[in-house]
Amino acid sequence: AMMILASKWIEFLLSNSTEQKRFLSNTYGNAGQERIKLIIQTLQKFIDTLGDKHVFITRCPGRINLRGMHIDTHGGFLNLMTIEQELVLIGHPRDDDKFCIYNLETKHKPFLSSFRSLQKEYPLQSSWKDICHHAQNRTDTSSHWHQYIIGTLLRFAQQTKRPLTTGIEVVVGGDIPEGSALSSSHDLCIVLLQALMYN
């Protein structure tokens, strides 16, 4: 992924240059020009919230599972197709283990935590089953989207068998309707995993 200033990304996306058209075509096919608005809104929220920093962009399209019923999380087979709506993440690496994750939708509270504090509540040496059981029994359900973030961070650390010593600050934005079975929560996990791999 390419890291340039967030403001330069906006300038590039608005440029209508040959490079911009090629970039959008390679990323989105014929729908490129329609997708710019969401990316620019998310970049602008990043600048307004975290400053004009060198950032990377990850994305994941929404998906339709023709069998439905969360069968993938129960070991079943999928019959998928993607849709144009997507989730976009604008990210910047940090030098410490803090994670500052904001959503374009203000109804979602920011997730602000360090990996060290997460490990106190969810020790990495615990089994994944124990971690999930503990998460299900939490009394604070005020921000369910935090659970997807916590699960992604812990699963990544457990799979790579190392604590996350460098955090990230990100803004996510999407146009996938929540609760519509188009995998908006799945996409949040995927763009966050992409950001962690980049980091």
What is the meaning of each model-derived region?
Residues 2-186, 190-199:
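ATP-binding N-lobe of GHMP and related small-molecule kinases
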